[in-house]
Swiss-Prot record:
The gene is rbfA. This is Ribosome-binding factor A. It is found in: Cytoplasm. One of its GO terms (biological process) is maturation of SSU-rRNA. The keyword Cytoplasm applies. Belongs to the RbfA family.
Length: 130
């Protein structure tokens, strides 16, 4: 259980430091063009691997461009994390694109469409009965 708490604390620290680095530390213009949100950080039990899930605001072209900038900055970010967290070995950083918000919005749109279709059917049924 203690190891689990340690992993959670390290994940929280990585999230905090990575947020700071993404907003102020990267000079790559591709990364600075739009808003990036860190949605989740997963750290392995041995603290050697770190998956950072990001949500990127913008269209698909912008997202691809920003994501390629993040991937190009991985080694720099790993070094900065190691310095800031003062860890013996900084974890390998891997970025993953989180499409949860997009999927949630598409589900909501489908539900709204179904509700509209149902309302139309109910309205036609009421008109038919009159």
């Amino acid at each position: 259980m203690a190891q689990s708490r340690r992993v959670e604390k390290v994940a929280a620290l990585i999230r905090k430091e990575m947020s700071e680095l993404l907003s102020n530390g990267i000079r790559d213009q591709r990364v600075n063009t739009t808003m990036i949100t860190i949605t989740e950080v997963e750290v392995s039990g041995d603290l050697q691997h770190c998956k950072i899930f990001v949500s990127i605001y913008g269209n698909e072209i912008q997202k691809d461009e920003v994501f390629s900038g993040l991937e190009a900055s991985q080694s720099f970010l790993k070094g900065e994390l190691g310095r800031r967290l003062q860890m013996r070995r900084a974890p390998e950083v891997v970025f993953k694109l989180d499409r949860g918000m997009e999927k949630g919005i598409s589900v909501l749109n489908l539900l709204e469409k179904l509700e509209a279709e149902r309302n139309i059917k109910d309205k036609k049924l009421i008109e038919f009965q009159e």
